[in-house]
Each structure stands twice: as C-alpha cells, then as structure tokens.
Amino acid sequence: MEDSNSYIRVSGFVLGSLMFQHLNSDSDVEGLILGETKAEERSNITDSQIDNIQFEHTINIQKHISCRKLNSFYNRIGEVNRDEIRHILSNYKEENVIGWYKQRRNTDQQITFREQVVHENLKRALSNHELIFLLLTPSEITTSGSTHKLEYAVYRSHGSQYCSVPVLVSNLGLLEEQDYWRLSASCSSVNYNHAVRKHRSKFFSSDGSLHEVDEINDMNNSLQGELKMACKKVEESERLVEKLLADVSDLRRMVNERKQELREISADGASTPAQPRENVLLCEVIKTLFPGASLLQTQALNFQGFPLPEFCCSTDHGIDIATTLPLILSHTLPKARKGRLGRGGGTSWRKCPLRESSEVPKRRKGMLEETDETLSVSGSETEEDLIPANRNGNNLDVSNSPVF
C-alpha cells in the first residue's frame, strides 16, 4: 500500500518578513523563492503485517528575493528573461530557486491566466518541473483600516490544473508531536560561509565529521576490542570448567561403581564363611625347634583329644628363618631327649602306675611355684637373665618349649 504526501514547510520569520515587506510597500510585490526540495520514503509496520509505505515530498522555503518592480523578469505576454533572473539571484544559484511569489491587494485567492503562463515559462527556463507559486492576498476587514486579513496559499501545477499544497509553519505550534522535525538549514550569506570555512578545520575533519565524534568512535572501537578479548577469555574459562565438571562426573561414577563392587563382594563373603588360614610362621618355627616331633606338627586330633601324627604338616613354605625370625636361632635351647622308639619307628608311650601319675601334678606345681618366686624378684630382669639363674640355683629341668 503506497501513499504520496506533499507539503510546504516555511519558518515563521520567513513568512513574517513577506508580510512585513508587503505592508511597507505601496503596490503589489513579487519575487523569487529559494529553498530545498526533499523526497522521503517512510514505512509504517502495523500489527496486521501490512507495510504502509508513504512517499513524503517536502519543500522547505528558506529565503525570498524581492524584485524592484513588477514584471521585472518577464514581459507582458509572460515570456521569462533568463538574464534578468540571473541578475536578480546575484550570488545565489539557479538550483536554489524552488518557485516564485506574488502579493496582490484586495483580490481573491485565485491564480490569473497571466500568472499561469509566467509559471509555465519559468519552469521551462529553469528546467525545474517542481516549481511552486506562493500567492498572498491581504485585505481590510474594517472600514477604518485597523484590522487586516492576509490569506496565503501555495500552488503546484499538474498539467493545466493548479492544486493547493498544505503549508506548515514551523514555529506556530507543535504540528508533529510524535515525530522529529527534519528541517534544512536556511540559505546562508557569503560572510557566514566565509567564517564557517575559516574555522571549519578546528571542528570538522576532511570527511565532514566532528573531531570529537572521531575520537569517541576510536574509543568505542578500543572498548569493543577489549570486550571481545574479555569474552574470549570467559569462553575459554567456561570450556575449562565444563571439562573439569565432566572429569568430576567420571570420577564420581567410578567411585560409585567401586562401592557397588565392594558391596557385592562383602555380600558374597557373608554368605560363604571364610576358610581358616594356616599359621605358616608358627609351623616353620616348630619344624626348626622340634624337627623330629611330628606330634607337635600335626593339625588333627582324634575323638579322645590326642594328636594324630599321620596328619602332620610336611609342606615347605619357603620361609628363611634366619632372615624372618632371627631370634629363634639365637635363643635355641639344647634339644630335648628323644623318647624311645618302638619297633615301628614311632614313639612308644609307657604307662605309669596310678601313684606316679598322681604325683606328677604335685611335682609340676612345686616347680611352677619356685619359678614364679624367682621371676617375681625384680621386674627389670629379662628372660635371658632369669633362665640361667633358675638353671644353676634350683637345678630345674630345662623345658623344651620354644622361647619367643
């Protein structure tokens, strides 16, 4: 959907100067209008997703140049004199001419045929088909002349027809409250342009931008570079944190699996009781101290509680006693007297009479009491000091049991 809007924008002081010139003259006045023409395309997007495109054609009236008399740049039949136009413009360019104006006293707001002819010839002379015609028609309201009325209108030609274009005066109120004013600078004088060019290098660069703006842009570029570097560092740290979190998750998973395996192993161990383990060191010590005593080396008993020599341990455990248990060799006592061997090579057991068997516990009890008295004399003596004392003083039989 496309719309086309055209309007004239004029500042209040330009319109006021036209009125002031007319009121201070004794006759009608005409002249040329200088300004700028600008076309814009505006797109308004609505909720219905339909783009409303508007073409705005704005004509800014910035200055007017009055002629010294009527019919100064055209003759009676409406032909335009190009040289006279250049003389009127003086230092201004023809490209700045956007139209012409005329003030008529006590007339209707209507274009005459002669004005139409002059307008068409002026369009061909200046090669500008967008020229406008500003018509001002003041009149008196009261007979005393105390009150005057001024009507003004701007016309554009479309073929043989002239239509009125709306005029917006900038300083007569906020005509566009929801929009920025897009006003062009007024036509400047020669002295103004000379002063601006003289000091332009202090404020503007070669491309027309302000020096402060360039410095701010440079600072902005530096800040953007620093921000990119900071973002890169943050990204690298985030990736490192993700990697560490993944490693921690793997370690936790491995720990949980290990705990589960230990639970399963403990559950299996509780269901099946552990087998008794053999005391290898004790077995080797007995073999070393009592090499021929198979009864001491057996691990089986009969129903009466007597050891069975057939089940003695005959396995070589591969233990070096001199390295593992050196004290056993240093404190080894004289070998006990061997018992009588029977015909079958085994140890024969001789039955004692009842009297002798009853006296044996008494004799052993007396020996233990004497030994306890000797050992309790001092608590600082070692076993090596006590054993010879008992051996010499009491003449006790030396026991064949190992000393640890």
Swiss-Prot record:
GO CC term, one of those recorded: BRCA1-A complex
Boundaries of every MPN domain copy: 7-161
Modified positions (Phosphoserine) in chain numbering: 401
Entry coiled-coil feature ranges: 219-268
GO molecular function: microtubule binding; polyubiquitin modification-dependent protein binding
Keywords: Chromatin regulator, Coiled coil, DNA damage, DNA repair, Nucleus, Phosphoprotein
Compositional bias (Polar residues): 391-404
Pfam families reported for this sequence: MPN_2A_DUB_like
Quaternary structure and interacting proteins, as annotated: Component of the BRCA1-A complex. Component of the BRISC complex. Homodimer. Interacts directly (when phosphorylated at Ser-401) with brca1. The phosphorylated homodimer can interact directly with two brca1 chains, giving rise to a heterotetramer.
The protein's name in its UniProt record: BRCA1-A complex subunit Abraxas 1
Biological source species: Salmo salar (Atlantic salmon)
